[in-house]
Curated annotation (Swiss-Prot):
<keyword id="KW-0336">GPI-anchor</keyword>
<feature type="binding site">
    <location>
        <position position="98"/>
    </location>
    <ligand>
        <name>NAD(+)</name>
    </ligand>
</feature>
<keyword id="KW-0378">Hydrolase</keyword>
<feature type="disulfide bond">
    <location>
        <begin position="41"/>
        <end position="243"/>
    </location>
</feature>
<protein>
    <recommendedName>
        <fullName>T-cell ecto-ADP-ribosyltransferase 2</fullName>
        <ecNumber>2.4.2.31</ecNumber>
        <ecNumber>3.2.2.5</ecNumber>
    </recommendedName>
</protein>
<feature type="active site">
    <location>
        <position position="209"/>
    </location>
</feature>
<feature type="binding site">
    <location>
        <position position="146"/>
    </location>
    <ligand>
        <name>NAD(+)</name>
    </ligand>
</feature>
<dbReference type="GO" id="GO:0016798">
    <property type="term" value="F:hydrolase activity, acting on glycosyl bonds"/>
</dbReference>
<dbReference type="GO" id="GO:0005886">
    <property type="term" value="C:plasma membrane"/>
</dbReference>
<keyword id="KW-0808">Transferase</keyword>
<comment type="similarity">
    <text>Belongs to the Arg-specific ADP-ribosyltransferase family.</text>
</comment>
<keyword id="KW-0521">NADP</keyword>
<feature type="binding site">
    <location>
        <position position="202"/>
    </location>
    <ligand>
        <name>NAD(+)</name>
    </ligand>
</feature>
<feature type="modified residue" description="ADP-ribosylarginine; by autocatalysis">
    <location>
        <position position="204"/>
    </location>
</feature>
<feature type="signal peptide">
    <location>
        <begin position="1"/>
        <end position="20"/>
    </location>
</feature>
<keyword id="KW-0328">Glycosyltransferase</keyword>
<comment type="function">
    <text>Has both NAD(+) glycohydrolase and ADP-ribosyltransferase activity (to a lesser extent).</text>
</comment>
Length: 275
């Protein structure tokens, strides 16, 4: 009997790790995502992030290459751009880098953070990008479009969020272009009040991009036809993590990471307890 129980829980845990990797994606609150807003620890993170960035470079060659490319572009466009007090070269470089080739790999790591937090090598990049949007946000709301080649399914109950940083466009034509959308995908029509218009920072200004932080929550969700989803009433923010990589958040970090690995630990302990 203990052996059967062990097998059951091991199978259950493995299923949890792969659920959602195939077929339509669930539109929910993205519980596995890394969604830190760094509330109360910005000064600490500004001190620590440069060191974290070097650590990330050592473990993530793609990020290092993308960062160096973005840094060159940022230095070229910086003199002709306006930005608020507190916005520095790190913030600008991160924002430019996101519009390049790194976004797909970065967002995958953000979405799957809870499954493997030890392999998250975008610590500083996540902070700088989050902070860039916070500094550039002026409270304006935008009506935007996002086309995907992946089908999303909404159960019809509850608020939702993307969890990851989400690119959208002021242009429906851009969102529905073959580069981003297919007949088997989903077209999102979104009202965002935390998203920031980043055309002036982008490698692709023709995309008319509005970048939405993953912690924006939409309280009204409506589906239309086969592949359109409307997201409205973005009045709340939700994060499961805060100041995870700052010394100010050391206690919270331990608790959060313990909760992340708890299911696998329970499975292993159960198996070891067999006679």
């Amino acid at each position: 009997m203990p052996s059967n129980i062990c097998k059951f829980f091991l199978t259950w845990w493995l299923i949890q790790q792969v659920t959602g990797l195939t077929g339509p994606l669930m539109l929910d609150t993205a519980p596995n995502a890394f969604d830190d807003q760094y509330e109360g620890c910005v000064n600490k993170m500004e001190e620590k992030a440069p060191l974290l960035l070097q650590e990330d470079f050592n473990m993530n060659a793609k990020l290092k290459v993308a960062w160096e490319e973005a840094k060159k572009r940022w230095n070229n466009i910086k003199p002709s751009r306006s930005y608020p007090k507190g916005f520095n070269d790190f913030h600008g470089t991160a924002l430019v880098a996101y519009t390049g080739s790194i976004a797909v790999d970065f967002n995958r790591a953000v979405r799957e953070f809870k499954e493997n937090p030890g392999q998250f090598h975008y610590k500083a990049f996540h902070y700088y990008l989050t902070r860039a949007l916070q500094l550039l946000s002026n409270g304006d709301c935008h009506s935007v479009y996002r086309g995907t080649k992946t089908r999303f399914h909404y159960t019809g109950a509850g608020s939702v969020r993307f969890g990851q940083f989400t690119s959208s466009s002021l242009s429906k034509k851009v969102a529905q272009s073959q580069e981003f959308f297919s007949d088997h995908g989903t077209l999102f029509i979104i009202k965002t009040c935390l998203g920031v218009y980043i055309k002036e920072f982008s490698f692709r200004p023709d995309q008319e991009e509005v970048l939405i932080p993953g912690y924006e929550v939409y309280q009204k969700v409506r589906t239309q036809g086969y592949n359109e989803i409307f997201l409205d009433s973005p009045k709340r923010k939700k994060s499961n993590y805060n100041c995870l990589y700052s010394s100010a958040g050391a206690r919270e970090s331990c608790v959060s990471l313990f909760l992340v690995v708890l299911p696998s630990l329970l499975v292993q302990l159960l198996c070891l307890a067999e006679p």
